[in-house]
Curated annotation (Swiss-Prot):
One GO term of the biological process aspect: DNA repair
Function, in words: May play a role in DNA repair. It seems to be involved in an RecBC-independent recombinational process of DNA repair. It may act with RecF and RecO.
InterPro entries documented for this protein: DNA_Rcmb_RecR (IPR000093), Rcmb_RecR (IPR023627), Rcmb_RecR_Znf (IPR015967), TOPRIM_dom (IPR006171), TOPRIM_RecR (IPR034137)
Recorded name of the encoding gene: recR
UniProt name for this protein: Recombination protein RecR
Length: 201
């Protein structure tokens, strides 16, 4: 059993920071110390921003993006092409594609990918919402921008099958996205090239 080195409030801060992806216990301790040292410049404003986000952030009922409005800013932007829909696994993938700035379209966030080994099936993802959006008839192309993993490929094939009865072109990102790679880690140039070289399934 390890000794406590600080009061319960600091220990709780460290424990919560350690649950953030990419931060382990050691990094969480360093981050906590940095925040405490910069209390007025960082810790207090960060606490306020987190409280405000907890109160105001919503999941878009149309596409699954996170925003402070529902529908989100992307879904209500009339300058975007309503006939083209990019399907992504997570919001981080949507943000990565937006950073690439190649296409001015709308999105659909699945909320994950099919993974039978992890017990994640079609009903656990926002696939039904995607089918409903395509069934409306306004969408002419669905671009599957899922990760190039085994689970991502499985998800792409399942979605293609679900959309096969609709008059919609289904494409996917070109294989410039490395197998096993995740969109959030790719640079803007790679993402832009992959979007331009997409192929029909």
């Amino acid at each position: 059993m390890s000794k406590r080195i600080a009061g319960p409030e600091i220990e709780r801060l460290i424990q919560l920071l350690a649950r953030v992806p990419g931060l382990g216990p050691r990094s969480a301790r360093r981050a906590a110390l940095h925040l405490i040292k910069k209390k007025e410049a960082l810790l207090v404003p960060l606490g306020g921003a987190m409280q405000e986000a907890a109160e105001k952030v919503r999941i878009c009922s149309c596409c699954g993006n996170v925003d402070t409005s529902d529908p989100c800013t992307i879904c209500t932007d009339e300058r975007r092409d309503p006939a083209t829909l990019i399907v992504v696994e997570d919001v981080s993938d949507l943000w990565a594609l937006e950073r690439a700035g190649t296409m001015n379209v709308r999105y659909h966030v699945l909320g994950g990918r099919l993974s039978p080994l992890d017990g994640i099936g079609p009903d656990d993802l926002n696939i039904k919402g995607l089918v409903e959006r395509v069934a409306s008839g306004a969408i002419k192309e669905v671009i599957l921008a899922v990760n190039a993993t085994v689970e991502g490929q499985t998800t792409a094939h399942y979605i293609t099958d679900q959309l096969s009865n609709f008059d919609v072109r289904v494409t996917r990102l070109a294989h410039g996205v490395p197998v096993g790679g995740e969109l959030d880690y790719l640079d803007e140039g790679t993402l832009a090239a992959a979007l331009r070289a997409r192929t029909t399934l």
